[in-house]
Amino acid sequence: MDRVADRLSALGSTAALELRGVTRMFGALAALTDITITVRPGERRAVLGSNGAGKTTLFNCVTGDFLPTSGTIRFFGEDVTAFPPYERIRRGLRRTYQISALFLGLTVRDNVYLACRGVSRARFSMLRPSVSDALMQSTERLIEAVHLTSVRDQLVSELAHGQQRQLEIALALAGAPRFILFDEPAAGLSPTERRELVEILTALPPHIGYIIIEHDMDVALRVVESVTMMHNGRIFKEGAPHEIESDPEVQELYLGGGHE
């Protein structure tokens, strides 16, 4: 843990992501109530809880798909509470989704190349050979980072489910993100695929922080340094993975039948 603390300290003191008193109402229903979270640059955190705890609504507020009813959201010190999603993407925020959004009729390489091109600041200079070469180099590097080099010329529709999830991570890494939201990346994966997912996430560049929502608690606790537990739209517990795993109240809520 000392090495983790040293790494986080070296990345700066300004919070990567800071939520203060975030509440989200749907009519009379409070999906989120007074959520306050601070995530440091390079920090890897899990947000866990049963279905209906508010995890996905939290992600939607961070990405700008939902605007908070009250409270503020800051990204690397900048107030982005009212920013649309594309402005947050421009500032280095990325997200994966529970449901894949891939081009099934294109190859792995084409999917990653298009993602790199879409977030490239030089996207209007594609005819310049230097720009095209740089994008292709980025494409190959990302494919290698998610262990898909051997299938880079295959159609995405031909990939195994686990490989498609790996491809989604590559797309999220396009354009040098500063922070990523992973929405259940282990969903539907076999034990072997989950082990590979853990390898990919733990090997991400140290400056990239992330929050992971995950129903597989074993996977989540292996790839993070801190955990936030949610229940009924509120923060229930926070702590290190070993503290959360051994907490009696968490065991009762999450492992004793409150988790699907």
Question: Residue locations for each model-derived region?
Answer:
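Glycine-rich phosphate-binding loops of nucleotide-dependent enzymes
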Residues: 2-260
